[in-house]
Structures are given as structure tokens and as C-alpha cells.
């Protein structure tokens, strides 16, 4: 009635079942590996995101103060819309890679893009070409290329009234950086009543003389002769940090543009029959005193971008060596300590593409963004009036 089992009657595992079992084990192992890898990847991403977020919070600039330098500009209503193509190349290896400023002498006519800052290619002989837009219609324009470490060169016969005007420059390094002077002597025509319209002690607030050099240096009155007579004379003098170079002198305040070519250690003389013109006061230099935020790592200012948003549009620029001045502790334009201070300056016309000088009552938002992506924003409120006698204003 009972049947005994033998070895031949034991249960057998089929090959198919064994394959399925092994496959399930492999799938489980692979799944475990994927989970481990995914967890590791997520952890790495989380750590990177955390570090990036920390950098964006900590590697940030602080702006301790903002200000603007202002000067008089002519509002002559001259013809506009001319373009000029300017090509510049370094004549030798020492001038290669230098930053230069191209300036067209316009007697500081308001609204014109008369300046542009560029960096020369790193190889001597390699040209770089830029276009200056919206220039006045001048038959014999004076165009200057100058840099902190290059010799100034001026072309004095550029006709902006002809189709597609262009000019080329070859610049060399300064051979001597000792200071020199440039002067202007202005004499009124006999019988002209120009000098009767202004007081002798108010000349400097009425007529301004400046150069087309790297920093657009403003000249100072050094002598006044025969005031009130038919041959009254005013003498101006400016100091430039080089003993060689050619520039243009611009006179601001007359009813028409006055520009003269001049070389260092020379005095230009002109006899005029001037009438007072319309002038305005506008900001031609924006300045920001910056430091690192507490806990920040070192910040390279030359890897920092600055966005300008205002009535004139929106434009982003990258800080260059030309824009940075060391106030305290800054080495190589890098802020390494919270006590380091730098002054970052911008010429609105030369440095910000499409911008002109900043007018009264303009609003401007400025955003500094470091290499880590950390941003610092400041709002500039331009006063509705500038106090007479002042040369700068806090913004």
C-alpha cells in the first residue's frame, strides 16, 4: 500500500528554471549597482550644487560707494549719423596686447559716440578694426589713439562727410614716460565783445579745454592777459604722463566746435572770433569702490562682468585692467582679503557700447557678476542738477 522513494525518484530542477533564477540574481545585482551609482551621482551633484550655491552667496562683491565725475559738453546740434572705421595694430611686440582708447575730437559734442576702448591683439602687426557710430559731419576730423603704455598718434585730416570713411593706426610703446606739458593760447579778435559776456573769475566755468589723450585730460588756466581789451588772451596748460605723442585740443563752450592738433611740449595758438554756445553738464566717468563680501574667496576683477541697464538701453561689459585702480591691498586686480579695496571706473562712451554720457535725472541699474555667478546690484540715481563748482557727485 505504501511506496518507498528511491534516488531515482528525487525532484529535478529544470535547466529553464535555473536560467530564470540566475537571470533574476543578475538583474537584482545590476539594479543594486544602479541604485548605488545613482545614489553616488546624486550625492556628488548635491555636493556640487551646494558648493556652487555657497560660492554664489559668498564669492560676492560689496559696493561701498558710487560716484560720478561730470564735465561740460557742447549742445551744438551738429549733423549726425556718420560712421568711422578705425583699424589699429601694434608696431612692436611691446605694444601688443595693450589697451588703447580711440577718440574723435568733437569739442565734447553731446550725444555722439566719440570714444571707444579696445585691446590690441597679442601679436604685433595683427590689426583690429572697430566702428564708431553716430559721429558729427566734420570734414577734417582729428582722431587720436592713445594708451597708458603706448605713444599717442593723431590723424588730423579724416573726412567724415565722405562715404565709408576709414583710418588706420600703427602704435608703438612709449620710449619715455616722463611728464610733459601741452598748452593752448587763445586770443580774441580785435573788436570782439566775447570777453565782455563773462567775468574774468568765471572763465573756467564757461570755457573748458581738454585733450584727446587716454584719460581725456582737462587743461587748467595758467594766465590771463589784457582782460577786457580787444586783444585779451587766455592761456591753458595740461600735463600728460609722456614726453612724446600727438593729440588734439578741444575747446568747449563756443557756438561751434574748435579742435586743434598739438604735440607734447608745444603750445598751440589760435585767434578766434567766438560767441558763447549752449552747454550742458553730464557724467563722463562712473566710479565704484568695491571689496569682497565677508567669507568670500579671492575675486579676480578681470573675470567679473558688469551689466548696465538704464534709459539708454542694456549692455554688459567685462572689467579690464584699464578700469581698475588699486586703493588698498589689490594685487593683479585680484581681491584676496576683505580689507582689499579697488576703484572700478567706466567711461560710459568708451567702455559701454551704445551709451553716451549720463545726463541729469537718468536712472541706471548696475549689476556686478563674479566668475562664480554671484551678483551684486546697485541702483544709481542721477541728480536733477549738479552743483556749480563741483567736479563729482555721489550716486
Curated annotation (Swiss-Prot):
Protein biosynthesis is among the record's keywords: no
Q: Per the record's keyword annotation, is Glycoprotein included, yes or no? A: no
Where does it reside? Answer: Archaeal flagellum
Q: Which GO terms describe its biological process?
A: archaeal or bacterial-type flagellum-dependent cell motility
Task: List UniProt keywords, sorted A-Z.
Answer: Archaeal flagellum
CC terms in the record's Gene Ontology section: archaeal-type flagellum
Q: Name one GO molecular function term.
A: structural molecule activity
**Removed propeptide positions:** 1-11
Q: What does this protein do?
A: Flagellin is the subunit protein which polymerizes to form the filaments of archaeal flagella.
What family is this? Belongs to the archaeal flagellin family.
Q: This chain belongs to which protein, by name?
A: Flagellin B3
Amino acid at each position: 500500500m505504501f511506496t518507498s522513494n528511491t534516488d531515482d525518484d528525487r525532484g529535478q530542477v529544470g535547466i529553464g528554471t535555473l536560467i530564470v533564477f540566475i537571470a533574476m540574481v543578475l538583474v537584482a545585482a545590476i539594479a543594486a549597482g544602479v541604485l548605488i551609482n545613482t545614489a553616488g551621482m546624486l550625492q556628488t551633484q548635491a555636493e556640487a550644487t551646494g558648493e556652487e550655491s555657497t560660492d554664489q552667496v559668498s564669492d560676492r562683491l560689496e559696493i561701498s560707494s558710487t560716484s560720478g565725475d561730470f564735465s561740460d559738453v557742447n549742445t551744438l546740434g551738429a549733423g549726425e549719423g556718420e560712421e568711422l572705421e578705425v583699424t589699429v595694430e601694434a608696431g612692436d611686440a611691446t605694444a601688443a596686447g595693450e589697451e588703447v582708447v580711440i577718440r574723435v575730437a568733437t569739442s565734447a559734442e553731446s550725444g555722439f559716440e566719440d570714444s571707444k576702448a579696445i585691446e590690441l591683439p597679442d601679436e604685433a602687426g595683427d590689426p583690429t578694426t572697430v566702428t564708431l557710430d553716430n559721429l558729427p559731419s566734420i570734414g577734417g576730423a582729428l582722431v587720436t589713439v592713445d594708451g597708458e603704455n603706448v605713444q599717442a598718434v593723431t590723424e588730423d585730416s579724416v573726412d567724415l562727410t565722405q562715404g565709408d570713411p576709414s583710418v588706420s593706426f600703427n602704435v608703438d610703446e612709449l620710449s619715455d614716460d616722463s611728464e610733459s606739458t601741452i598748452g593752448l593760447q587763445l586770443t580774441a579778435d580785435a573788436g570782439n565783445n566775447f570777453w565782455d559776456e563773462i567775468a574774468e573769475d568765471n572763465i573756467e566755468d564757461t570755457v573748458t579745454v581738454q585733450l584727446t589723450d587716454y584719460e581725456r585730460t582737462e587743461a587748467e588756466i595758467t594766465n590771463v592777459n589784457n582782460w577786457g581789451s580787444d586783444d585779451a588772451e587766455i592761456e591753458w596748460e595740461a600735463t600728460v604722463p609722456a614726453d612724446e605723442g600727438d593729440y588734439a585740443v578741444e575747446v568747449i563752450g563756443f557756438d561751434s566746435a574748435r579742435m586743434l592738433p598739438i604735440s607734447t611740449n608745444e603750445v598751440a595758438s589760435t585767434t578766434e572770433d567766438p560767441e558763447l554756445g549752449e552747454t550742458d553738464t553730464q557724467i563722463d566717468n562712473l566710479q565704484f569702490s568695491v571689496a569682497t563680501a565677508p567669507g568670500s574667496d579671492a575675486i579676480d576683477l578681470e573675470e567679473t562682468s558688469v551689466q548696465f541697464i538704464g534709459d539708454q538701453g542694456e549692455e554688459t561689459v567685462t572689467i579690464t585692467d584699464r578700469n581698475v585702480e588699486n586703493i588698498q591691498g589689490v594685487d593683479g586686480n585680484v581681491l584676496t582679503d576683505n580689507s582689499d579695496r579697488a576703484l572700478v571706473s567706466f567711461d560710459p562712451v568708451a567702455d559701454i557700447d551704445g551709451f553716451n554720457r549720463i545726463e541729469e535725472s537718468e536712472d541706471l541699474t548696475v549689476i556686478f557678476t563674479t566668475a562664480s555667478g554671484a551678483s551684486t546690484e546697485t541702483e544709481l540715481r542721477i541728480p536733477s542738477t549738479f552743483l556749480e563748482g563741483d567736479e563729482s557727485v555721489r550716486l
